[in-house]
Amino acid sequence: MINIDRFYKMKEYAPDLQIKEVSFGISKLYIINIQTVSSSELTNHFILDYLSKRSLIKNELISNLKNDIQYHIPSISFIEIKETDITEYLYNGFTVLIYKNEAIAFETKASLDRGVNEPSSEPTIKGPKDSFNENYNTNIGLVRKRLKTDSLHIKELTLGTKTKTKVSILYLNDIVDKELLDETITKIESIKSDKILDTYYIKSLISNENKSTFPSIKSTEKPDTISKSLTEGKICIISENSCNALIIPTFFIDYFYNDEDNYQKNIYIKFVKIIRIIALFITIFMPAIYLAIITYDQQILPTSLLINFSLQRASVPFPALIEAFILMFTFELLYEGDALTPSSRGTSLSILGALLLGDAAVNAGVVSPIMVIIVAVTAISSIFFVYYDFQSFIRYYRYSLMFLASFLGIVGVLFGFIFIITNLCSIKSFGKPFMITISPKLNIKSKKKLIKRGLMIQNTDKETLWKR
């Protein structure tokens, strides 16, 4: 007999637990569900339909609950479960029927998720405008809708001793790197944690980002990005209750690629990629180069420009480094405030704040006009990179280079540049070099091809390059 008393004890700390008793002769049938996660409409439809038909023979004993339900409601789908699994099924929105030593679970999960909306962090003008939401099945369905092939394999795991979160590993079996797949599965299966509430929990536990400032795993909320990555032989991770999926492995060049590039002309894509590369150098190196020149290497500037800069800074009471940090810190406040403020007001407040604060700071003699220009151009250049993780890397090295430039001048900037390149070339994303699509293993015949294309590697060539 299944112990019903423990469910009555559960009601002491789970007031949304509902238990109903129905008598059949000398025996009782128990209907148990959790009202907050199960649909009362579905529960009534399934259970009451069964009870209404059973009431005609109410005094007849039930010899086998499973067979009895199949006989009276042949169209209904259910699963026979063990006593030890009842609690887990209840928390997942199932309604459980218990009769003597039998337990039958009906899926009556309430719809607690939002619909498929436009992506919020990766806005797009051309191409699909759907995005993942917190519904696990919906997210997998959005990928299946795009990849109608038997080679799409899904390995499902359950992570988190407390949360029991379903996690899926998606890959195309005919093109995936088997070593990469085995390493990914091993790392995910080895996760020991009480809670997995989002894919970011998985990301922090399986990546090497604690040892490196560069994001080696990319997250996205766009199904078309996931589908494209799968066709390149990559692996994707989708988690229950998360609107972001992970892409493994991720390379440096991937952060210069935008999903809208798929729907643009080839010549335009090449031009925009050049702009993005220039923007990366500007947003990381421009403040440091200015500080190096204005502090130590004034001879680099033309005399007239140096005199102009000196006159602008004559009324500024702070060293150039402190002046730069005042403006950078103000920009960071505006950036974070814009991210946390509702979109209808955030942009207006940021523009208004930047204009008023910049003008007031120059008039008050706190900062020089050239420093305002430097910080403004740096901030605008960082907008080209929409991925928050990559922007964190940009911030880290921007401030580090500013310190080096303030103490060592241009030499410090060069040391910082060498360190960044060395660090980038030493990073691996799940055994694959982070810079592999820029400096791949090539035979003699393909070197000429790489020189011609440079960073303009076509999407169709990426897969073969990083697998070599």
What residue spans do the PLM features occupy?
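Membrane-embedded alpha-helical signal segments
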Residues: 1-285, 299-303, 424-468
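Amphipathic alpha-helical protein-protein interaction surfaces
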Residues: 148, 314, 366, 409-410
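Active-site proximal loops enriched in glycine and acidic residues that flank catalytic Cys/His/Asp
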Residues: 239-241, 320, 343, 408
